[in-house]
Amino acid sequence: MKRRPRRKRKALDIILAVICASSLAAAALIGWTIPHEGAVYSEISAEAGSAEGGGIDWEALRARNPDISAWVSVEGTPIDYPVVSPREGDPQGFYLNHDFDRNWSFAGCPYLDPRGTADGRHALVYGHHLNFDSEMFTYLRDAWRQEKFDTLGDMYWSTPAGGTVRLHPAFSLSVDKSFAGIQRFDLTDAAETRAWLADLSAQAGARAE
């Protein structure tokens, strides 16, 4: 009667050891993959040029991936990435786990909500919050707090048709992706856009002075 518990304990120890080994292997894989993907985006950034430096090489980016729609960078943060538009036939959220080269990726690639356009009044960009502060949109995870919001510099938003626009952050709020306030893509004029922004600002956790 005493042997069975020992067999069970031994089996449990083996299972736990396997789980532990698997977890360590996964951690090692993630630990290698994220810096590797960061290097890939550094390479793309070097090839594309800089919005702050005067221009983006859209031809080079299109040659690498025709899904390119914009480039976003934010002063004072590591954010400096191409922004893509999923192509017809891509599964929903394709770029959440595929990089700019359309290879499988933990970090993914920032991409536009297909209901908007890069040069429209409302361009909603999706990007990951990872456990690495220097990757994707992780720096923005606490930007709805005033003290973090105040560290954000100006944003450069570049598109092939519109050139580069320099924008100052106006406010920030933390909401679910289904939040009704960010589902507006039918804004027709400046007055309607200002009213929409004023409504969002009233709900914000942080605002510019």
Task: Name these PLM-found stretches.
Residues 1-11:
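N-terminal Lys/Arg-rich, disordered targeting/topogenic segments
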